[in-house]
Regions:
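Domain-level signature for soluble enzymes in the chorismate/prephenate branch of the shikimate pathway
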Residues: 1-91
Length: 91
């Protein structure tokens, strides 16, 4: 069991690195988008989820895991992007 836990811990560390990269893209988007209304783009949310579900199916990841995880990730990223957008324009 310990080797399984170590494997999960290593994957978590890798996921954190990848999420940090994703966060950087959200921060770049906040710098580029001209209005706060541009932070949330509903069609893009659905586009991302569709692509993720296609990738999940190819990789053997259950959609019951992938979809809610990505929807929450997207919501957190949108919130972060919005905060960054506001901060950049208040300086």
């Amino acid at each position: 069991m310990e080797d399984v836990r170590e494997g999960v811990d290593e994957l978590d560390r890798e996921l954190v690195k990848l999420l940090a990269v994703r966060q950087g893209y959200m921060e770049a988007a906040a710098r580029i988008k001209p209005t706060f209304d541009d932070v949330r783009v509903p069609w893009r949310v659905e586009d991302v989820v569709t692509k993720v579900l296609q990738s999940a199916e190819k990789e053997g990841l259950s959609g019951r895991i992938a979809e809610p995880v990505w929807r929450e990730l997207i919501e957190c990223c949108i919130a972060h992007e919005g905060e960054v957008w506001k901060k950049l324009r208040s300086e």
